[in-house]
A protein has these predicted regions:
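Glycine-rich phosphate/pyrophosphate-binding beta-alpha loops
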Residues: 177-192
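Glycine-rich beta-alpha junction loops
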Residues: 118-122, 181-184, 209-210
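Flexible, charged surface loops at secondary-structure boundaries
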Residues: 37-43, 65-66, 170-173, 237-239, ...
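Gly/Ser/Thr-rich active-site loops/lids in small-molecule metabolic enzymes
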Residues: 135-144, 188, 194-214
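Catalytic core of DAGKc-family lipid kinases
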Residues: 3-5, 9-11, 63-176
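Short glycine-/acidic-enriched loop or helix-start segments at secondary-structure transitions
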Residues: 14-15, 56-59, 81-84, 125, ...
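ATP/NTP phosphate-donor binding region
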Residues: 1-48, 52-67, 87
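ATP/nucleoside-binding phosphotransfer catalytic cores, i.e., glycine-rich phosphate-binding loops
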Residues: 167, 197-200, 207-271
């Protein structure tokens, strides 16, 4: 039997066309432990959703125990995971090997696994604003790039940051972004860490720092192709297994697109 675990909230509620007469289950209503532990060996599972759907899976089930093939039939608004592995939204993609050995982030007393990225600063602000828009207009398509540009110019204030990478300490002023990347992509197609490999034994921290809003704005479009890293006066990269970032003032963090508000510090580790 092939089960389709559909997240009705993904892609702003826009439904994905599924095969006729297939077994569809609402992924938001089930107990993942009961569901996966009671599958027959020949059963298969298709996750229908986006990055948030996969994040929910890895945080509600120990995927190292999986005995069945699990596929992604992508239906997200950003699909950073799909961008990173170079697959299409038009087919079911086997994903078992991507669901284990994941980094863990500690933030505001929570411990969360993530598949793609977690970001402090402007990106977290964008997710916070997107949540507000969704609350007011649930079916409205979110323009994350537009939110980011408006935030950069008018709303978001850069922070002072202290970072620690495998015991080495650094300090930066005027920090706009401080994502720690397990994959290469963030924000629905921005190639934030072009050299990151999700199968490596390290994470990549990207620090985007500049006193000038205009310079920051002019460089911003180059993130989509990963060319921003050539501007080493603005973009700093660090690789390590254990990374922490502390800001001087609280702001939002996003973890695979899910927002955590009022964060001063996060730490993340890939064991």
């Amino acid at each position: 039997m092939k089960y389709y675990l559909n997240n009705p909230l993904s892609n702003n509620g826009i439904k994905k066309k599924l095969p006729e007469d297939c077994k569809i289950i609402d992924a938001t209503t089930i107990d993942y432990n009961d569901f996966f532990d009671n599958l027959k060996p020949e059963d298969e599972v298709v996750m229908v959703g986006g990055d948030g759907t996969l994040n929910h899976l890895v945080n509600h089930y120990d995927c190292s125990k999986l005995k069945n093939n699990v596929y992604l039939y992508a239906n997200g608004s950003g699909d950073d995971f799909l961008h990173d592995i170079g697959e299409s939204k038009d087919k079911e993609v086997l994903i078992n090997k991507y669901l284990v050995n994941l980094p863990i982030v500690h933030v505001n007393g929570k411990e969360v696994k993530y598949l793609n990225n977690m970001s402090f600063g402007l990106d977290g602000y964008c997710c916070e604003e997107a949540d507000r828009i969704k609350a007011k207009t649930p079916k409205k398509k979110i323009n994350y790039s537009g939110i980011a540009i408006k935030g950069l110019l008018f709303k978001f204030k850069p922070k002072h940051a202290w970072i620690n990478v495998d015991g080495k300490e650094y300090e930066f002023d005027n920090v706009w972004l401080a994502p720690t990347m397990h994959g290469r992509y963030v924000g629905g197609g921005m190639k934030m860490a072009p050299g990151q490999d999700r199968f490596s034994d390290t994470l990549t921290l990207v620090i985007y720092t500049s006193k000038s809003k205009i310079k920051s704005l002019m460089l911003f479009p180059s993130i989509f192709k990963g060319e921003h890293v050539k501007n080493t006066d603005v973009v700093k990269q660090f690789t390590g297994k254990k990374i922490s970032v502390r800001f001087d003032k609280p702001c939002a963090v996003q973890i695979d697109g899910d927002t955590v508000l009022d964060v001063i510090e996060y730490s993340t580790e890939l064991k």
